[in-house]
Amino acid sequence: MNLNSTPKICFIIGMMPRTGTNWAYDILMQSNHTGNIGPIWEDNLLNHVETLESAAKKIASSWDSKWKADHQKIEVLRLTESLQKNFELGLEKFVHQQFLTSSCEADNPTYLILKSPNAWHIKPPKTLLQRNKCIILTRNPHDLIASGMASFGWGLFGACNRYIESTKAIVQLNDSCNQCLTISFEDLKENLCESVQQLYNYLDISLPSFDFSSLAVRGKSPTKKNEKMTWTAQGITSKEQIQKHKTSKIFMSKIQHMVVSELCITAGKSLGYSFGAQKTPNVVRWGIRAAFRLFCFVRKLKG
């Protein structure tokens, strides 16, 4: 397959659910230059590079020391890089083949848009993003975790741990592939027009004549028996809604906000978010840290 003559791929990766993955996807799908591949195949596709590393390490670690093959262990790990490049090429071909058999409305799109609300375990690609594009969506930890707890029933410590690990993956991805575009949920909500223009400029495609404030945004909530919900962008981007949100502490208690502040402040700052002075008493902070370490230890034991 000649990759130069096929559409490029734009991966939309939300650091976690509730970061606006569907929103950004729907914004870009209003263009005649974008297409999809039918089913949402991309969800977790980029996460499987870790499987290659695990397989290589598992093979090498099983070798008996009597074989004196330590130097071969290094070669096996180097082989992983070659496997990863081939894996990425195969993934790219897979996406294009799915496009050829799907009911994409655009006959010859410039980009195929794929989305995934899951940055955890993503490894920086070796060559995939040299030919394609990647949009990363972030959100401040308080609102993201509160929204996830309300919509998906997340546990507080588990959500904080996932936020921290997803942030590490995003920072590593950005450091390795500086051609990625990062947009926050707050940007979409508070500066919709500018954010839409930024998305289209990034893909170098023309902005369609469309009222993006009236765009229907889709989602669903497992805590409501997977009930599908639709709302318009205007419903969350109006000045009244933004001010209402800023003056209310949604979904979480004061102590829960303390936990998020204590555990996720470093991760949030690395994504560009700013926080007020920490007012939590030291004894409470130590207790939160100790409980979180115990949670992570027990979780690791359970595998």
Residue ranges, per PLM feature:
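Cofactor-binding loop segments of dinucleotide-utilizing enzymes, especially the Rossmann-like FAD-
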Residues: 15, 39, 137-139
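PAPS-dependent sulfation machinery
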Residues: 30-115, 120-122
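Soluble or luminal CAZymes and related metallo-dependent hydrolases
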Residues: 83-95, 117-118, 158-166, 191, ...
